[in-house]
Amino acid sequence: MSAAATADTTSPHIPVLLPAILDAVAPVQGVWLDGTFGAGGYTRGLLEAGADRVIAVDRDPLAFEMAADWAGSYGTRLVQQPGVFSEMDTYAVALDGVVLDLGVSSMQLDLAERGFSFMRDGPLDMRMSQEGPSAADIVNEASAETLANILFQYGEERASRRIAKAILTERALAPITTTLHLAGIIERCLPRAKPGQSHPATRSFQALRIAVNDEYGELYQGLMAAERALKPGGQLAVVTFHSVEDRMVKRFLTARAGAGGNANRFAPEVQRDAPAFTLRSRKAIVADDAEVAANPRARSAKLRIAVRTQAPAGVIDAKSVGMPVVKVGN
């Protein structure tokens, strides 16, 4: 039986802030690229709103398996493109819009065998593309220092060193190969969660998932790829779910819109590229109370939108956008 056949379809992935995106970028027309196809919520929303064509990109083969029942109804208006959004400018250029949802799809969380969830017992995997080193490889092979850095830099876990030490102690007895095994180790290192608080393993699982899939590197490269792929007047909409992602997106768009200013007013004026984007708003768009009530996942979501100018695409270094970098290895 395929993974698509075993996925839980009773609790479908609800696209966060979709009405806000469609309202902000209206009228929806031309060719759009959905860089995080997932369960297809944004793609379908764009097509129903009037996009001539949507190029749907995802590195997870399961995404396209799950879409088999409905994708054909859109005919040639829906183009399924296996791959990563950091390479979007090799799939298409002169795009009218790009949308990125940086959250994990519920279809991935719902499948225990994918190893993303600390609430379901399964192999400690977390690979979106199902290729390359898994979370188990990192947990069982990385040094204590590397593990602590991953947990702190990628998950903002303040107990990172305590957890890393506990992982090394546990793996000396037996390999850590399942999600619940790892979650139990982390739980023993932290106070019990109070009502309304997130599970103690939330930050650590987030950090490992980011490391396994190089999510920050993908985001950094993807933002520059979007700048190259969008035509003048094309719109970029990015939905983030935690502070590091949002900081990276905000700094990128602010810098590429020429709105950063000099850090020191006494420093000499720095020669800047012509602005490649204009910001739709200085502040991020967040979900209203009604959406949060209907979809609790929307509580932490932030949407930022910018419009491409006619200026040539440029380059910005990773440090300037605040991208954390941890060398994953012993």
From Swiss-Prot:
EC number from the UniProt entry: 2.1.1.199
Annotated keywords: Cytoplasm, Methyltransferase, rRNA processing, S-adenosyl-L-methionine, Transferase
Gene Ontology terms, MF aspect: rRNA (cytosine-N4-)-methyltransferase activity
Keyword presence, Nucleus: no
Catalytic activity line of the entry: cytidine(1402) in 16S rRNA + S-adenosyl-L-methionine = N(4)-methylcytidine(1402) in 16S rRNA + S-adenosyl-L-homocysteine + H(+)
Annotated S-adenosyl-L-methionine binding sites: 40-42, 58, 85, 101, 108
Domain of life: Bacteria
Position of the signal peptide: none
Pfam families reported in the protein's UniProt record: Methyltransf_5 (PF01795)
GO biological process: rRNA base methylation
A single Gene Ontology CC term: cytoplasm
UniProt keyword RNA-binding, yes or no: no
Subcellular location: Cytoplasm
Enzyme class: transferase
Classification via InterPro entries: RsmH, SAM-dep_MeTrfase_MraW_recog, SAM-dependent_MTases_sf
Function text: Specifically methylates the N4 position of cytidine in position 1402 (C1402) of 16S rRNA.
Family: Belongs to the methyltransferase superfamily. RsmH family.
NCBIfam families: 16S rRNA (cytosine(1402)-N(4))-methyltransferase RsmH (TIGR00006)
Name of the protein in question: Ribosomal RNA small subunit methyltransferase H
Annotated gene: rsmH
